[in-house]
Each structure stands twice: as structure tokens, then as C-alpha cells.
Amino acid sequence: MAIYGIGTDLAQVSRIAAVLERTGGRFAEKVLGPDELRVFHARRARSEARGIAFLATRFSAKEAFSKAIGLGMHWPMTWRALQTLNRPSGEPYVVASGELAAWLDARGITARVTVSDERDYAVTFVVAEAPDDVAAARSGAAS
């Protein structure tokens, strides 16, 4: 396996909160996958600030992932097709669905993700990995 791409994103939590308020909550439904949406609602019910921070980290994760795989937010990379979930240990991991999952599987691409947030910002870093020949072809190093 070799690095296919890396991506990072920094989201301003207050900006995410403003968009959420302006859209009457529809922003969360547009951006979050079904499992993420359940966690968002549960966290927001306990603490508005923690719910918004969760949304900011997941928005940031989708942006960083889209950069790592080199697609940006273009098909098959869609907001809801990628979810960042947490293992019982707290470790984040990504789960793709639908056409994005098929696109990743066809290339053997996997990813590692880390997310963090403080009061004002959420940050994500993603490393996408692929078989050596796939990564080399993307970088232009293939013969």
C-alpha cells in the first residue's frame, strides 16, 4: 500500500452554526449520513454546542476526504455518501456507501482519518491509501 492522497480541512464552528440556523436545520440533513445524523441529534439534545461541534467535525472530514481522494465534492463523492463514525475506543473511521463505496473499492482505496475540535474550530486530516500501482498511476509515476 502507498499513499494515494492526503487532505486536510479547517472549519470555523461559528460559520457552521450560522448555516445551520439559516437553513432551519436542513444543513445537517443535507451533509450528514444517517448514522452521523443520529449522533448529531443525540449530542445536540444534550448540548447545543457539542452538537454543532460534531457537525463541524463531520463537515470538515468530508471536505478533507474529498481532497485526499482527489475528487473534491464531485461525483461520486457526495455529502451523505461518506460518514465518519467512532469505534468504541473513540477512534474515528470512515464508511462510504453507494457509488462512492464502489469507486473506492474498484481502486482498492482505504483511508485513515483524525478529527479534532476546540471551541472555535474543527480540523480533520485524512490519508488515503491504495495499492502501489494505483497510487503510482495517480501520481504520474507509473511507467
From Swiss-Prot:
EC number(s) given by UniProt: 2.7.8.7
GO biological process: fatty acid biosynthetic process
Cofactor: Mg(2+)
Entry GO terms, CC: cytoplasm
Domain of life: Bacteria
Cellular location(s): Cytoplasm
Example GO molecular function: holo-[acyl-carrier-protein] synthase activity
Binding residues annotated for Mg(2+), in chain numbering: D9, E63
Catalytic activity: apo-[ACP] + CoA = holo-[ACP] + adenosine 3',5'-bisphosphate + H(+)
Alphabetical keyword list: Cytoplasm, Fatty acid biosynthesis, Fatty acid metabolism, Lipid biosynthesis, Lipid metabolism, Magnesium, Metal-binding, Transferase
Family per similarity comment: Belongs to the P-Pant transferase superfamily. AcpS family.
Function summary: Transfers the 4'-phosphopantetheine moiety from coenzyme A to a Ser of acyl-carrier-protein.
Protein name: Holo-[acyl-carrier-protein] synthase
Organism per entry: Burkholderia mallei (strain ATCC 23344)
Lineage, broadest ranks: Bacteria, Pseudomonadati, Pseudomonadota, Betaproteobacteria, Burkholderiales
